[in-house]
């Protein structure tokens, strides 16, 4: 989405903002963006090794704003596979419903930790190839790969991952 761009428009709960493209990783379909207009709190990131098959996950995004409007939408699902398409070990397969506008958004565990980044879904091309319409077959790059891209921008103030026993569940924070 950002290939070749030095800046992009980003939808936020406060409206549309401009973001600079700091770094990209085409192999994992990731980019590091810096929003203009202030400082924003960092989100806690959980290591990929903590994720389990069947674990509840969610994303927040601005899908299909022309139809669904500009308010953020939360969708929940599960980790359907510990590997992505074609058993790609860099990604999770998720049952979280995603639409255009969710791509690039954080995938959260039930404690509000970022565990991945939503990158793709099976859609019409898969339906043409298989004769069946995929339902909630979506993918997120694991947090380990996102952290590698973010490493130059992290500092000591980055929050530690929330612990299961001491932190509220994701649905209590939304």
Per-region residue spans from a language model:
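C-terminal cap/linker of serine protease catalytic domains
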Residues: 18, 41, 62-70, 114-174
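Short Gly/Pro-enriched turn/cap motifs at secondary-structure boundaries
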Residues: 22, 96-98, 142
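Extracytoplasmic/secreted envelope proteins and their assembly/folding machinery
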Residues: 2-7, 30, 37, 57, ...
